[in-house]
């Protein structure tokens, strides 16, 4: 609360190094709502583009870490090698491999040209081919299934009662995704097709995340091919009108919630952040009961 709105934008990006873009997007969308300002269509599409690239990065990173915790270090190394592809693409667009600083109040400060569009399409083709291999591994490899199938079970009813969100909830059959329930940024123009599973075990959580990668590849291609022309920013007052609002976006791991209160000055009176991992902690006990200690790293 001691920093200006613009200074806070860079602070919010550093709440999470893996999902810095969605944190800044949640913040700017909330501030823009208070100021009654809407970013131009091209800026909204770029916000969605970077968000989906960030989701790809997060899911591949998660796949590698989970594989490592289960003792599958070859899958860990292969997936993290492929993760470099999307990190290079994010660097091509923003200049940074982490903390992309794409958002500004009122729009974005990065754009994509024809060369970058070609690189994005080639990157999606490569990653899609690799992801097909990962899906085959997590659904057909007997050794892998021995560590994931019927492990860490959470039923639809339990997920509903515990408020599970993100891929964790969707792996138990919950139709919860902020991009679908309350579309923001470019999602009204480039909507998602939600991915769910019913089993509610570790295997289902792997499958949901990997299938979400295919959906992100589709969205990136669609945005690249149909991105609207126009400005990247619109004017926004330095002093944000008095009021309070909430801003919700779908981070890679679930709903990210921002509460923002303005007192009419160039500084916020209050900003409260609730991350998706905090919501999913409530489900850990349910998914862990009856399993071995060695299963806990993958369950977590």
Where do the model's predicted regions map?
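Active-site bordering "gate/hinge" segments
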Residues: 1-300
């Amino acid at each position: 609360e001691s920093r200006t709105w613009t200074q806070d934008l860079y602070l919010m990006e550093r709440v999470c190094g893996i999902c810095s873009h969605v944190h800044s997007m949640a913040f700017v969308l909330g501030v823009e709502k208070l100021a009654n300002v809407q970013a131009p269509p091209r800026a909204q599409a770029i916000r969605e583009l970077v968000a989906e690239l960030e989701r790809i990065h997060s899911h591949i990173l998660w796949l590698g870490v989970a594989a490592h915790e289960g003792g599958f270090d070859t899958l860990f190394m292969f997936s993290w090698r492929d993760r470099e592809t999307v990190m290079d693409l994010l660097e091509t667009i923003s200049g940074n491999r982490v903390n992309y600083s794409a958002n500004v109040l009122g729009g974005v400060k990065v754009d994509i040209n024809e060369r970058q569009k070609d690189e994005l399409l080639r990157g999606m083709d490569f990653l899609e081919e690799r992801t097909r291999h990962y899906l085959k591994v997590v659904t057909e490899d007997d050794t892998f299934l021995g560590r994931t199938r019927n492990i860490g079970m959470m039923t639809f009813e339990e997920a509903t009662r515990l408020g599970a969100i993100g891929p964790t909830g969707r792996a138990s059959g919950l139709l919860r995704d902020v991009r679908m329930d309350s579309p923001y940024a470019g999602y009204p123009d480039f909507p998602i097709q939600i991915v769910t599973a019913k089993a509610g075990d570790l295997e289902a959580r792997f499958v949901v995340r990997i299938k979400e990668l295919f959906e992100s590849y589709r969205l990136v291609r669609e945005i690249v091919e149909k991105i609207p022309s126009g400005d990247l920013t619109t004017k926004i007052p330095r002093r944000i009108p008095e009021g309070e609002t909430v801003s919700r976006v779908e981070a890679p791991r679930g709903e990210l919630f921002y509460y923002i209160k303005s007192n009419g000055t160039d500084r916020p009176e209050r900003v409260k952040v609730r991350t998706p991992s905090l919501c999913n902690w409530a489900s850990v006990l349910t998914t862990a009961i009856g399993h071995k200690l060695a299963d806990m790293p993958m369950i977590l």
